[in-house]
Amino acid sequence: MTSGKNGITYAEAGVDIDAGNALVDRIKPAAKRTNRPGVASGLGGFGALFDLKAAGYQDPVLVAATDGVGTKLRIAIDTGLVDGVGIDLVAMCVNDLVCQGAEPLFFLDYFATGKLETDTAARIIEGIAEGCVQSGCALIGGETAEMPGMYPAGDFDLAGFAVGAMERGTALPEGVVEGDVLLGLASNGVHSNGYSLVRKLVEISGNTWESDCPFGDGKLGQALLTPTRLYVRQVLAAIRAGGVHALAHITGGGLTENLPRVLPEGMGATIDLDTWDLPPVFGWMAETGGIAEAEMLKTFNCGIGMIVVCAADRAEALAELLSAEGETVARIGTVTTTPGIAYTGKLL
């Protein structure tokens, strides 16, 4: 057995345990900010504990979701603007959870890189914590994997895992009928899907991340890194108010493919494209790439990040409630008995 001053260390193989420990110490205050009723352990254990009774549940059903941020990370890595991608990660998971009618309870992250850069990792995880605070769920654990030889210098990847709960018998979708109203909640841009196409369009346009933004203020890279909106608190308030029959998070697949996922078999919807304002980024992308309207609608959110399907006699009250919660709400269509999505009006 080799020992003494000539022995090889783990650090010499590319894994810095001390850096990992320093990261945990730095992010503990951020994680602590996310504590909520039900959290029964802190960071550092072999597992994290959560007490559903302490969270107020009597007969809970658990709901789980996992997701990533996709190639939006490439822009964050190239620009060094990593602070918002943690919010993206949380949003992609918890916005899905709430579509089942569940309240997000806790979140875990997976951060992988070739060489751990403590400041970069801390900024990302602090963003994750901010996303958790905004959506009312606790950051109760995670994994930081330093894997030499697996990633180019400076690169990293992220995955998130969220668990929520609802009382038995309250799951969505439920009760969707012909004539139900579609309330569209505004997005703030591209959110976190379609970025392989976005990056191709930037290349075609001859711009760089440091170019002045052609569709708004500031630099192009910064504009494209606007964090995904979190809809959890607002939508949960609408669910509790009554009349919500289904929710659709508009991510990959756009309006065309995501709304049918929450409609009963044999049903569809009409959507009036003239009922909301298209964020400028989508017009720029369509023009730059000569992208057809139908392709835009099945790729991007096109300005609607979440659809609330509700009873017609509750639509006005729910729109007012959601507006009071800070949402920009548009009445964009209705449920029909014709399968698929039929569009009227003009997007572009």
Swiss-Prot record:
<comment type="similarity">
    <text>Belongs to the AIR synthase family.</text>
</comment>
<keyword id="KW-0963">Cytoplasm</keyword>
<dbReference type="InterPro" id="IPR004733">
    <property type="entry name" value="PurM_cligase"/>
</dbReference>
<dbReference type="GO" id="GO:0006189">
    <property type="term" value="P:'de novo' IMP biosynthetic process"/>
</dbReference>
<dbReference type="Pfam" id="PF00586">
    <property type="entry name" value="AIRS"/>
</dbReference>
<keyword id="KW-0067">ATP-binding</keyword>
<dbReference type="InterPro" id="IPR010918">
    <property type="entry name" value="PurM-like_C_dom"/>
</dbReference>
<keyword id="KW-0436">Ligase</keyword>
<comment type="pathway">
    <text>Purine metabolism; IMP biosynthesis via de novo pathway; 5-amino-1-(5-phospho-D-ribosyl)imidazole from N(2)-formyl-N(1)-(5-phospho-D-ribosyl)glycinamide: step 2/2.</text>
</comment>
<keyword id="KW-0658">Purine biosynthesis</keyword>
<dbReference type="GO" id="GO:0005524">
    <property type="term" value="F:ATP binding"/>
</dbReference>
<dbReference type="GO" id="GO:0005829">
    <property type="term" value="C:cytosol"/>
</dbReference>
<dbReference type="InterPro" id="IPR016188">
    <property type="entry name" value="PurM-like_N"/>
</dbReference>
<protein>
    <recommendedName>
        <fullName>Phosphoribosylformylglycinamidine cyclo-ligase</fullName>
        <ecNumber>6.3.3.1</ecNumber>
    </recommendedName>
</protein>
<dbReference type="InterPro" id="IPR036921">
    <property type="entry name" value="PurM-like_N_sf"/>
</dbReference>
<dbReference type="InterPro" id="IPR036676">
    <property type="entry name" value="PurM-like_C_sf"/>
</dbReference>
<dbReference type="GO" id="GO:0046084">
    <property type="term" value="P:adenine biosynthetic process"/>
</dbReference>
<dbReference type="GO" id="GO:0004637">
    <property type="term" value="F:phosphoribosylamine-glycine ligase activity"/>
</dbReference>
<keyword id="KW-0547">Nucleotide-binding</keyword>
<dbReference type="GO" id="GO:0004641">
    <property type="term" value="F:phosphoribosylformylglycinamidine cyclo-ligase activity"/>
</dbReference>
<dbReference type="Pfam" id="PF02769">
    <property type="entry name" value="AIRS_C"/>
</dbReference>
